[in-house]
């Protein structure tokens, strides 16, 4: 279990709108305890999740979205 920016395939961010409930819902649907919209350098707005299961991908620093 770990916290991080949940990733789409190919290390891409789930973009979001600050203040919306979309990230919290996405994180919970993927087994996390909740989340919010944050900002990830190089990706822009992105969903940050708390306590995601290890099987759920998170953004890896230094790897470009492709």
From Swiss-Prot:
<keyword id="KW-0872">Ion channel impairing toxin</keyword>
<dbReference type="InterPro" id="IPR002061">
    <property type="entry name" value="Scorpion_toxinL/defensin"/>
</dbReference>
<dbReference type="InterPro" id="IPR003614">
    <property type="entry name" value="Scorpion_toxin-like"/>
</dbReference>
<keyword id="KW-0528">Neurotoxin</keyword>
<feature type="disulfide bond">
    <location>
        <begin position="12"/>
        <end position="65"/>
    </location>
</feature>
<dbReference type="InterPro" id="IPR018218">
    <property type="entry name" value="Scorpion_toxinL"/>
</dbReference>
<protein>
    <recommendedName>
        <fullName>Alpha-like toxin Lqh7</fullName>
    </recommendedName>
</protein>
<dbReference type="GO" id="GO:0019871">
    <property type="term" value="F:sodium channel inhibitor activity"/>
</dbReference>
<feature type="disulfide bond">
    <location>
        <begin position="16"/>
        <end position="37"/>
    </location>
</feature>
<keyword id="KW-0800">Toxin</keyword>
<keyword id="KW-0738">Voltage-gated sodium channel impairing toxin</keyword>
<dbReference type="GO" id="GO:0090729">
    <property type="term" value="F:toxin activity"/>
</dbReference>
<dbReference type="Pfam" id="PF00537">
    <property type="entry name" value="Toxin_3"/>
</dbReference>
<feature type="domain" description="LCN-type CS-alpha/beta">
    <location>
        <begin position="2"/>
        <end position="66"/>
    </location>
</feature>
<keyword id="KW-0964">Secreted</keyword>
<feature type="disulfide bond">
    <location>
        <begin position="23"/>
        <end position="47"/>
    </location>
</feature>
<feature type="disulfide bond">
    <location>
        <begin position="27"/>
        <end position="49"/>
    </location>
</feature>
<dbReference type="InterPro" id="IPR044062">
    <property type="entry name" value="LCN-type_CS_alpha_beta_dom"/>
</dbReference>
<dbReference type="InterPro" id="IPR036574">
    <property type="entry name" value="Scorpion_toxin-like_sf"/>
</dbReference>
<dbReference type="GO" id="GO:0006952">
    <property type="term" value="P:defense response"/>
</dbReference>
<comment type="similarity">
    <text>Belongs to the long (4 C-C) scorpion toxin superfamily. Sodium channel inhibitor family. Alpha subfamily.</text>
</comment>
<comment type="function">
    <text>Alpha toxins bind voltage-independently at site-3 of sodium channels (Nav) and inhibit the inactivation of the activated channels, thereby blocking neuronal transmission. This toxin is highly toxic to insects and mice, and inhibits the binding of alpha-toxin to cockroach neuronal membranes.</text>
</comment>
<dbReference type="GO" id="GO:0005576">
    <property type="term" value="C:extracellular region"/>
</dbReference>
<keyword id="KW-1015">Disulfide bond</keyword>
